[in-house]
Amino acid sequence: MYIKTQDGFADGDLANLERLLKIVDDELSTIDGLIRESSDPDSEGLFDRGEYMTGVALTAIQQYIGSTYSQFKINRAAALRLAPNVNHGLTLVSVLNAGANYWKHQDEWGLRAVVTRDVELLGSQAQQTIKIIESLTPWSDYTCSNLISSLVGNGKVRLMALVPQLILWRQEIDLLNAEIS
């Protein structure tokens, strides 16, 4: 939840999210170093470790998104359509939401569908999630990490780089709330 002040915003949820994302980014930096030193980072589980951290961070971002728009009479669909846009008519928060849903639910989609990457075997919500993700990165190994890398644009998986964009989105929420209040 945030409060609008004379100087801007007091946003305790964002402050908590930033603390978490910094911890995750620090861990991802450590993992990157271990990957560079390793002769077989895949067998050592280093890629999986990074993917896990990234997936957990996506769910924290999703929680921030939900706690921000839900304090007003703004529905989820409208909140997910607000700028900033990333590409193909998609918004940053819709992509982050899809990434979080992917992380949380992929294990429920059935082993065959996930291993073969057969979208036709998925339910409609899962298909929509994959469609959004594939607008930025292929559905493949380490999908969450690849998604963040494509959003950040520098080839790195660093989640703090998303915070300025989330702040822009929060400003859009505030503008929409002012319009409907």
Region roles according to the model:
Residues M1-G45:
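Charged alpha-helical initiation segments
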Residues G8, G12-A15, R19, Y52, ...:
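Alpha-helix boundary/N-cap detector
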Residues E18, K22-D25, G55, T59, ...:
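Generic structural signal for well-ordered, non-transmembrane alpha-helical segments
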Residues G33-P84, L90:
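Short, contiguous, well-structured surface segments enriched in hydrophobic/aromatic residues
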Residues I65-R76, K104-L111, N177:
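Long, hydrophobic, amphipathic alpha-helical segments used as structural scaffolds
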Residues G89-T116:
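Histidine-centered, metal-coordinating catalytic motifs and their short helical/loop contexts
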Residues D118-L147:
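Leucine-centric amphipathic alpha-helical interface motifs
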Residues P138-S181:
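A hydrophobic membrane-anchoring alpha-helix module
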